[in-house]
Amino acid sequence: SRVFNYGKHEVIHFLLSNIKYWQEEFHFDGFRFDGVTSMIYRNHGLGENFTGYDKYFSLNTDVEAVTYLQLATELIHAINPFAVAIAEDMSGMPGMCLPIRYGGIGFDYRLGMGVPDFWIRMIKSTNCSHWNLYEMWHELTTRRPQEKVIGYCESHDQALVGDKTIIFRLADSEMYTGMDRAYHSPVIDRAIALHKMIRFVTLALACDGYLNFMGNEFGHPEWIDFPREGNGYSFHYARRQWSLADNGYLKYSQLLAFDTAMLKFARKYRVMCKRDAENLWIDPNAAVLAFSKGGLIYVFNFHDTNDARDFTLPVHTVGSGTYDVIFTSDERAFGGFG
């Protein structure tokens, strides 16, 4: 794709006036900057492995583009101090979400782009019982201090034409025949369970924000495809079918009920305000991951056949006495087995 020449004053004036226009005329209070990686590197970050700081700060860095982004975030917050600026940057540029006065670029949040890529890779490559839980923990918890990250399971990169949503990868063709509430099969039951667990563990280990994407909160089955020459300019897939979740006879409503309860849980226990996640137990053979955060114990069983009854878990210094189950993905109201 073509990029702007950020070294020209006329270009900078045009882009900044565009931001101001949307804020003042339409009262926009949030901006997501797409393709930031392509902007800030002269090679657009293509084929680059960002494994060291020399990859971030070199002659390949487009200083003029970085300066424009600093001006843009400064302007956004000058017009509305409560406005939010989010960067989509797959390179992990240091300082992206630090204030400009500290040498940063000034964004409020960055998207945790490695997380959805991790989930798709795991789903495509191996059975859930053999997922690498150590890698899962690393992907969901590794972030720079003082930089706010938005956790999410999937976005347009997964849901657009040419790829599949998480639920479609899990259930495949049975999405079209097996979503009646009265129907059960190993494929559908496993897909429903994993879809809930993937969302919950991603939210639980997010520290700054959590993002739902256009229907993944109820497991929308199909991709998004905007009208174009290749599809005869059809609007057929340029939609999200909320009627699926509103229909009380389908499992989509159970997935949505889970999402609603999960978000209420996150608000009640201030999950996004806690930064003290501690890995308590990883058992690769049993496919069990357990951790503490904010005084709560989270236990996830990713094994597709072992229900891990009478499982003993060392909780260390989190607390003493008895523990109560305050939230479970296996409730019947959520499509579980109780």
Regions found by a protein language model. Give the residues of each.
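Acidic glycine-/aspartate-rich tracts in secreted/extracellular proteins
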Residues: D330-E331
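Alpha-helical packing segments of well-folded alpha/beta enzyme cores
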Residues: V11-W22, Y68, A72, L194-V201, ...
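Substrate-binding/active-site clefts of carbohydrate-active enzymes
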Residues: S1-T61
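Catalytic cores of secreted or luminal carbohydrate-active enzymes
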Residues: Y237, Q241-V271
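Conserved alpha/beta catalytic core and glycan-binding cleft of carbohydrate-active enzymes
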Residues: H27-D29, H44-E229, F235, R267-E278, ...
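Short acidic-aromatic active-site loops that bind/stabilize oxyanions
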Residues: F4-K8, I188, G248-Y252
